[in-house]
């Protein structure tokens, strides 16, 4: 299977290309190969071999900012960019019958609706987090949400590196949605609670709040704290290396292939039953 990777200068885009090239060198059956590497418009790295760019061996795939030029070179597109760019890639893939793996976060309700409509024509695996651990955590939280009435407060704490733009994280929103049984709900910022570089978010009509921290080079940490008088239940996930998200995205691309149509998530890919 030939994969296209967008946002090649970003943390995830670069890591995905590195992983594909590394895996290509050791694959016997060539389960996947790099077919295209796509950068933002007018990027000064266009024309450079993707392998050279990620400090690996040359692969004969040259970075481009024009996806039209490489549409015949890939089967599935992996996108971890920005919301507006993702929408452009979704429209392109629908027009050209290409399946997608989307890990872009910070998507609005209207953008999520675009993805849902597109999935009636192409196959899309969309997730705010491609780690196995988070997928299992969400399964556990399905049970916790059923007993949430026994706790006085439920809080979500998420920490990421100081370059991450979206606050709160897409994973934190997903966690809250699982607990609330509300998919793709909005998050409201209470500016009165902003202090010391920490922003606290929460819907105005319930007691579930999201606390977001941006500091240093934290890959990703998410905790759910269920508290009552005298006790606390905490469920926590820590990501120590970005490679867990990369491997989840690649596994999703292989699972999705060219033939599947519909909207899927990592739970569909992993087939976890709890």
From Swiss-Prot:
Residues making up the signal peptide according to the UniProt record: none
Pathway the protein takes part in: Amino-acid biosynthesis; L-lysine biosynthesis via DAP pathway; (S)-tetrahydrodipicolinate from L-aspartate: step 4/4
Recorded superkingdom: Bacteria
Enzyme class, broadest EC rank: oxidoreductase
Catalytic reaction(s) noted: (S)-2,3,4,5-tetrahydrodipicolinate + NAD(+) + H2O = (2S,4S)-4-hydroxy-2,3,4,5-tetrahydrodipicolinate + NADH + H(+); (S)-2,3,4,5-tetrahydrodipicolinate + NADP(+) + H2O = (2S,4S)-4-hydroxy-2,3,4,5-tetrahydrodipicolinate + NADPH + H(+)
Assembly and interaction partners: Homotetramer.
Protein name: 4-hydroxy-tetrahydrodipicolinate reductase
